[in-house]
Amino acid sequence: MQNRVVSCRFTGSTARRATMPEGIRGRSHILFLVPLSRAESVGRLHQVQRFKVNLPVFVGSVAVIALFVGIGVIAPKRAESIFSGMQTAILSGFGWLYLLSVAVFLFSMLFLAFSRYGELKLGPDDSEPEFRYLSWIAMLFAAGMGIGLMYFAVGEPMTHFASPPEAEPLTIAAQREAMSVTFFHWGVHAWAIYSVVGLSLAYFGYRYNLPLTVRSGLYPLLKEGIHGPIGHVVDIFAICGTMFGLATSLGFGILQINSGLNYLLGIPQSIYVQLLLVTVVTAIATISVVTGVEKGVRILSETNLFLAVLLMLFVLVVGPTGTLMRDFVQNIGLYLDSLVLRTFNIYAYEPRPWIDSWTLFYWAWWISWSPFVGMFIARISRGRTVREFVTAVLFVPAMFTFLWMTVFGNTAIYVDTTIANGELARDVKADLSVALFQFFEYLPWPAVTSTLAVLLVSIFFVTSSDSGSLVIDTIASGGETATPALQRIFWCSLSGIVAAVLLSTGGLTALQSATISTALPFSLVMLILVWSLFVGMRADLARTQSPGSLGPRAYPASGVPWQRRLAMTLSTPDRRAVEKFLQASVLPALEAVARELTRRSRPASVGRDAETGALTLTVPAEGHRDFVYGVQMSEHKLPAFTAYDATVADVRYEARTFFSDGSRGYDIMGMADNQIINDVLFQFERYTGFVRSPESSLLATSPEER
C-alpha cells in the first residue's frame, strides 16, 4: 500500500487539505508553505518549502527524544541512578555477548573483504566513487573517532600506566600493557563495528536499491516487511541512538573546551559560557550541514585531518622521535600478539571490574554510536568495492590512530617518568578533561599547541554534529539524501538544544548511560545485519556468475572481421557520431525487439530520456525487476600511446549499455542493427535465467533503481 503526500496551504485561519498518490514506497512527504513577509507577499501568498519525511519515523523519534530529555530535565539524579544501574547490570550480565558479537563482526568483515564477495561493488558494476580517496578517509575518520582521540590520547595511556589491569603500576610492564590495551580499544574492533552497519546500508542501499536506512539491512529477513512497523521501530531506534550520542558527546565536549579555555585564558567554567559554546558550535555545524556533504562536511573534515597531522608531527619532532618510532613498532607487535586473547578475554576465571569499566564500556559505546558512523560512511562510499570499503575502513583509520596514540601516549609516559616525576599521572587522575593541555606544558610553545588543540576539539565537534544531523535527516526521510535545507537545520538545531538543556539540568550522565544501554538490543540487530549481508551477497554472486554478465556476445556471434573490430576499438567517435548511431541503429533495433516481444504476448516499450537522450527497452515483470536494456552516450578520457595521439582529441564518446540488475555496461558503438538485436536477445536470455534462479531470487525481487 502506498503512502500519500499531504499538502497544506495556510491562509489566515483557514487551511485546505489535498492528497495525491506518492510513488516512493515506504515514504511520506509533507509539503509546508512558509509565509513570506507582508511586503513580499503582495501578489504571492506563500513560498513553498518541501519537507520530506517518513511520518511514523519522524513523529516517533521526536516523541522518544522529547520523553528522554524530559526525564533528564525533571529528575536528573533519579534518571542517572536508574540508567547507570541498568548500564551496570547489562555490562556485568551480558558482557560475554558484547565480546562475542564484536568478534563475529570483525571476522565476518575480514572474510567478506578477502573472499569472492570482496569484488562486489557498492552500486552498479560500473559505478565510480563520488569522493577522492583522501577526502573519503578524512570524512570517515573525523566522524568515527575524531573527538575521542583528543580526549583520550594522553588520558587513557596514562590511566592504564598508573592502574593497569594486570601488570604492576608505574613499571615497564605497565607501559607495555597500557599501550597494548589502548591500541585494542581504538583498533580494528571499533571500526569492524562501524563497518557492519556501514557496509549493510551501503550494500542494500546501492546494490538492492533500498532506502539508505538501517531497516534496509533486514531485507533478506523481512522482505517488504521492512516498510512496516518493524522497520519504523528500527529506524526510530537508530535516530534516537544517534541523537543521544550526538547530544551527550557535544555536552561533554563542551565541558572539555570550556576546561581548555579556562586553562589557557582563565575563562570561567560556568553554564553560561558552556551554553554560549553550544550555540557557536551548533551554528557552525548548521552552516556546514546546509552546504551538504560535498562542500561543508568534506572541507571541515579535510581541514581537521590536516591540523591533526600537523599537531601530531609537532609532538613527534619535539619529543623523543627515535624512541617513539621504536615504540610504534613495538606497540603494533604487542597489539597483534594479544589480539585474539583480548578479543575473547572476559576474565571469566579471575573476575575484574576493570573489564566492565573499559573494554565492555567501549564496545557498548561503539555499538550505540554505530548507526550514526555507519550511516555516514555508507552515504559517502557509493562506488567502492566491498574489499576496498572494508580494508580502508578497518585499517587506514586504525593505523593513523595507532601512530597518534603512540606519539601522544608514549610521549606522555616518557615525560612523566623522566621529567615530571609522576606529576602528570597525578594531574590526569585528578581531571582527565585537561590532561592534554597539562601535557603540552612540558613541550615547547604550550600556548600555541593548546590553542590548536582547542581548535581541533571544536572542529571535531562540528564535523560530528553536522554529519550526525545529515545521518538523522536521511533516516527520518526514508533514505532521501536530497532534503530541504530547513529540514537539516531542524535536526542540527535539535541536537544543540538537547545538549544545552541537559547541560543546564545535569542530565547528561543519565542520557549517556541510557544510550550505552541501548547497545544490547542493537548488537542483536547487528548480528542479523551480518547474516543479511551473507544472504544478499550470495544472491548477488549468483547473478554475476550467470552467463553474459561480463560483456556483449554479439561480436563473436556475428562474424565481424577482426580488422574491422580493431578499427572500431581504435576509433574516436565524437558526440555527433554517437547521437547519429543511437538514432539510426540502436533505436530501430530496440523497436524491432519490442514489436516482436509484444507480438508474443510480452508487452515491451522503447523510451528516450529527454535530458540525456538515453534509449531504453523495458519489459515489465510482475514481482521482479523489469528487464531493461538501455544505451546511453558516455564520455571517456583516452590515453596517449604515441606523440600523434597527443595532438588529436583526447575524449572518446561511447554508446554504452546499462541494465536493471546493475551489471557492468559496455560500448556497442559501430554495431549493425542485427548485431544489436543479437546482444539484446542474449541479455534477455541472461535476465530470464536471473529471475528464475532460486539462488538470485532475493536480488531479482528487490526494487528497481530509485
Curated annotation (Swiss-Prot):
Disruption phenotype: Inactivation results in loss of protection by both glycine betaine and proline betaine after an osmotic upshock. It is found in: Cell inner membrane. InterPro entries: BCCT_CS, BCCT_transptr. Keywords: Amino-acid transport, Cell inner membrane, Cell membrane, Ion transport, Membrane, Plasmid, Sodium, Sodium transport, Stress response, Transmembrane, Transmembrane helix, Transport. The chain crosses the membrane at residues 55-75, 94-114, 134-154, 181-201, 236-256, 271-291, 305-325, 358-378, 389-409, 442-462, 489-509, 516-536. Induction: Constitutively expressed. GO terms for biological process: amino acid transport; sodium ion transport. Uptake is stimulated by high osmolarity. Stimulation is probably due to conformational changes. Residues 76-93, 155-180, 257-270, 326-357, 410-441, 510-515 are periplasmic. GO terms for cellular component: plasma membrane. Its main location: membrane. Residues 1-54, 115-133, 202-235, 292-304, 379-388, 463-488, 537-706 are cytoplasmic. Belongs to the BCCT transporter (TC 2.A.15) family. This is Glycine betaine/proline betaine transporter BetS. It comes from Rhizobium meliloti.
